[in-house]
């Protein structure tokens, strides 16, 4: 009798234990799903805020990048943009595709980056291959996230570039909207035409491969100096701006290569660029010198630094708000 009672108790204990494990697993899965949703929502909000504030500087930068005349300055470029029909509105050319591209870009980027970082950290903790919070983990996660984002959103950035450059003097204005642009490019240049500039974009993952490890490192340093207290807005601004400036200077030439490649439509002066990225690189250096690879970098730094500060600050605070109020959603 005692043996039967003991067996029954063991069975009940086993069932209860199994139920608890299932509940824990279910809770863990729900937590992970919520975390992914928080990352994506925070990324969307950050992209939206950055786009609204920095589109005019993006228009100036793109115009400088695709114009290979040697006498162009930031001020003369701004004047030529404002002198065209439309005036100040010209500074917001490409805002629609920018919003359409930026919002999913940051949603994909931040969620992929966080997922990869957590995955690699777990594997590293199991096998102790690298030190904790290794820069290699941050770099690899950033590169994978950057590549995924570039592949997903490349056609949108192509359309944004065409929207901006078709307004330049002597260009034919033929794109009326995002859908019309996509259909027109597909008919004239084929499916591959929608992915012009993807090669330089993938080369540009070097940018995030430098930026995100630096951002994480600066945050870690500032947190130590702050005695491990939560970072405030000033610390986030410092970490994001310094890491962005360094990464932008290191990886800038890919931006010029991408813009020239995306602008190589049939009626563009940049249609003369043929071949792969290396041949385009050599042609620019031969015809314009090394400075040609850094066209628009000054205005780019004026654009990306505040853009990065807005993006990362918005991201961190939206993420914090959603995490603290997860029971209300």
From Swiss-Prot:
GO molecular function per UniProt: NAD transmembrane transporter activity
Topological region Mitochondrial matrix: 61-90, 157-193, 252-296
UniProt Solcar repeat ranges: 34-119, 133-221, 231-321
Subcellular location field: Mitochondrion inner membrane
Transmembrane spans: 40-60, 91-111, 136-156, 194-214, 231-251, 297-315
Record's bilayer topology term: Multi-pass membrane protein
Family annotation (InterPro entries): Mitochondrial_sb/sol_carrier, Mt_carrier_dom_sf, SLC25A32-like
Keyword Amino-acid biosynthesis among UniProt keywords: no
A Pfam family recorded for this sequence: Mito_carr
GO cellular component, one term: mitochondrial inner membrane
One GO process term, biological-process aspect: NAD transmembrane transport
Record key words, sorted: Membrane, Mitochondrion, Mitochondrion inner membrane, Repeat, Transmembrane, Transmembrane helix, Transport
Intervals, Mitochondrial intermembrane compartment: 1-39, 112-135, 215-230, 316-329
Domain of life: Eukaryota
Family of the protein in this entry: Belongs to the mitochondrial carrier (TC 2.A.29) family.
Function, as annotated: Mitochondrial solute carriers shuttle metabolites, nucleotides, and cofactors through the mitochondrial inner membrane.
Protein name (Swiss-Prot/TrEMBL): Mitochondrial substrate carrier family protein W
